[in-house]
């Protein structure tokens, strides 16, 4: 590490420090694909700075609520990717990647009429380590000493991946004081009757083939 570069096994990676995508001289970098993992630029307009500087494709690490942008969950909808159409794609969110495969199997086999999602989630950088003022009193409490309910966009994000389920799922999150563990609890009302064993058969079947 030095001279604005990281060297790994003889390969040099250049380090830069800019606020906006348009501030970077991407042409000089000879790069045509960018992974945007800032979580800050979540619209076509905010990402336009990349394309104005010769970037051809952008992969965003957070979901974007825009029907023109493909939110991809592998094993569920990656077949929808069209290189000639999708210059921006996202990896959706961690909770959506947890939820979408289950929703896909259940909806395909039993048809989901509506559902409620609860995600038990470790703290993120929107939480605070110490009590401090906040417009949401629950978020004002120390995240490592409290459990507090908050909103989640995962249920709405499912509507981007399964348009026929838009508005049919609702959900909330509970932030809990653990370092790196999460789970998602789902309750669905289904069109077709099922049993525990039949549901497990359908859920386990995709695990026996490559994603």
Q: Where would I find each of the regions flagged by the language model?
A:
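Single conserved hydrophobic/aromatic residue that forms the stacking wall/gate
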Residues: 201-211
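N-terminal Rossmann-like NAD(P) cofactor-binding subdomain of oxidoreductases
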Residues: 1-140
């Amino acid at each position: 590490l030095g001279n604005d570069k990281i060297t790994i096994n003889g390969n040099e990676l250049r380090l830069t420090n800019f606020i906006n995508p348009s501030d970077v001289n991407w042409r000089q970098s000879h790069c045509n694909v960018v992974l945007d993992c800032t979580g800050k630029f979540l619209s076509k307009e905010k990402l336009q700075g990349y394309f104005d500087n010769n970037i051809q494709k952008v992969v965003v690490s957070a979901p974007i609520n825009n029907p023109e942008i493909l939110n991809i969950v592998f094993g569920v909808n990656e077949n929808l990717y069209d290189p000639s159409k999708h210059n921006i794609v996202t990896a959706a969110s961690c909770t959506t990647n947890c939820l979408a495969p289950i929703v896909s199997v259940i909806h395909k086999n039993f048809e989901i009429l509506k559902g409620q999602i609860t995600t038990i989630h470790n703290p993120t950088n929107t939480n605070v380590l110490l009590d401090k003022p906040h417009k949401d009193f629950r978020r004002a409490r120390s995240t490592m000493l409290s459990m507090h309910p908050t909103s989640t966009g995962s249920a709405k994000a499912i509507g981007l991946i399964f348009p026929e389920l838009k508005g049919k799922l609702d959900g909330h999150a509970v932030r809990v004081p653990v370092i790196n563990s999460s789970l998602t609890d789902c309750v669905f009302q289904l069109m077709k009757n099922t049993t525990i064993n039949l549901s497990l058969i359908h859920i386990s079947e995709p695990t026996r083939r490559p994603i």
